């Protein structure tokens, strides 16, 4: 099967969002701090701060990530069955929201890379430099590709 550029961009963004959703569900259901050894080191590595990774926090985040995944894939033209069941503006609005969120995170990541409020000796700094910020920039580009391409949506 050949995918259009819009569909490929949606698949990439959806894969990242879906993987993030799966990780949140894993942490919520198992209580594991994988891939870190402790919840504190997980929080520090992911967020550069101490936050509790409790089901009360993780389940709502997983639900938001799942909804975002479905809407981006729908806006990409990959889920026509879902496009027929939601207002046509909803996948577009959610994709705009995802693009804004990842752009803001990418800008924050660039600030942290400069050393503002982040130490180069931490795992967070290295992960932010090599993974988080590049992934957010790629997701932003993917969202723009999804949004720029014409996609028939049911109104």
Where are these regions (language model features)?
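Cytoplasmic juxtamembrane regions at transmembrane-helix boundaries
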Residues: 2-5, 71-96, 154-155
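Hydrophobic cores of alpha-helical transmembrane segments in multi-pass inner/ER membrane proteins
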Residues: 60-69, 131-146
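Transmembrane alpha-helical segments of integral membrane proteins
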Residues: 107-119
